Amino acid sequence: MGQTFAEQILGHASGRSDVQAGDMVVVNVDLVMMHDSLSPSIIETLHNELGAERVWDRDKVAVVIDHVAPAATVRQAEQQQQVRRWVAQQGISHLFDVGRGISHPVLIEEGLVQPGMLVVGSDSHSTGYGAAAAFGSGMGTTDIALALATGQTWFRVPETVRVNAVGNFQPGVSVKDFGLWAARTLRADGATYQSVEWHGVDFLSWRERMTLATLSIEVGAKAGIVAPTGLGAEHPVPEWLRVEADASYSRVVECDLSTLEPQVSVPHYVDNVVDLADVGRVAVDVVYLGTCTNGHYEDMAAAASILKGRRLAPNVRMIVVPASSESLHRAASDGTLATLLAAGATIGTPGCGACIGRHMGVLAPDEVCVFTGNRNFRGRMGSPGANIYLASPEVAAATAVTGYITHPRNVLDSTEQAVFA
């Protein structure tokens, strides 16, 4: 019987070729990621509870200061100072400090994550490494500390849900709509402790694929792996990692992208997804473009294509927080950033921004936000009384122009709503 991507990668990491779903395996990890919010507790666990003096391999550890970057409080500044000193003391090779961006895209940009690798991180959206066809999985403090000490961890090999795409997107529709469609179809628990394989999106860049990989955790997945076809020479695929026709899947679903309409996740659950046409006229206060799910160059460019020559609607704030400095520099070099600024958007430091509700644009009670991120739970971006609608960068930009949740086509096909600079 053939193997899924999860079975192949976990088999390779465990030194076994016969791995199947349900097996228990001890695996060697290729990279451990830890970020600023959990690093202090991980460091304490590593040294005080496990008794380890040093990490097992300083070249296979990446520390990223991205969750509250720059620090918003003295306590956060002290914690980040502690992390920097620890990194220097350990001789760790890879520290990505304030302004470099979010761990998931940054580690792929740096070439630290490649197809077939096994990566564990102290963040639930570590499934994002599947954008580069790696097995990425989030873990808690103790498991990350153990991986730092030994270079190993264990998994029950997950079953796999296969999500197929056919066709291509119509104007105004993009990969975020596909990801939200999958959340709507599979539901929040539809892939609990399973791997999600994404197929049929070879035309997407790895950054666009990250939308799918990061949304995998929102259906309960242990990992979300996008088929590596089309990744390019900078992401060489090992010969042993391949699609096997006779692999066994727990479920297979298919989406015709050519008929897909814009999707919106309405408060307060990610899988509470409806067609945009069914949302009604919802006025918004804030449009927030960012996160590891949709804060990349491609997302900023998509928004800029709608905002070009237009201004934000009165009483709408638009905050753009790039996912990485690389995406920010690219947007600055080709005029994308200038277009966003001309429209009235505010640009933040690359990083997680308000995604965890701790700084850089948190919401007040009763405020309505269209967010290109991945979660819309109560209190996710600040006040529990705020309402968060998840949508694509295209929908976000169109909404910023009109002041209410809007199909991109309504702005692109009409000059009436445009206010030219």
From Swiss-Prot:
InterPro entries: Acnase/IPM_dHydase_lsu_aba_1/3, Acoase/IPM_deHydtase_lsu_aba, Aconitase_4Fe-4S_BS, Aconitase_4Fe-4S_dom, HAcnase/IPMdehydase_lsu_prok, Homoacnase/IPMdehydase_lsu, IPM_dehydratase_rel_enz. SUPFAM superfamilies: Aconitase iron-sulfur domain. Catalyzes the isomerization between 2-isopropylmalate and 3-isopropylmalate, via the formation of 2-isopropylmaleate. Binds 1 [4Fe-4S] cluster per subunit. This is 3-isopropylmalate dehydratase large subunit. Belongs to the aconitase/IPM isomerase family. LeuC type 2 subfamily. Pfam families: Aconitase (PF00330). GO terms for molecular function: 3-isopropylmalate dehydratase activity; 4 iron, 4 sulfur cluster binding; metal ion binding. Its EC number is 4.2.1.33. Gene3D superfamilies: Aconitase, domain 3. Heterodimer of LeuC and LeuD. The gene is leuC. Pathway: Amino-acid biosynthesis; L-leucine biosynthesis; L-leucine from 3-methyl-2-oxobutanoate: step 2/4. GO terms for biological process: L-leucine biosynthetic process. It catalyses: (2R,3S)-3-isopropylmalate = (2S)-2-isopropylmalate. [4Fe-4S] cluster binds at C292, C352, C355. Its cofactor is [4Fe-4S] cluster. It is an enzyme of class 4 (lyase). Keywords: 4Fe-4S, Amino-acid biosynthesis, Branched-chain amino acid biosynthesis, Iron, Iron-sulfur, Leucine biosynthesis, Lyase, Metal-binding.
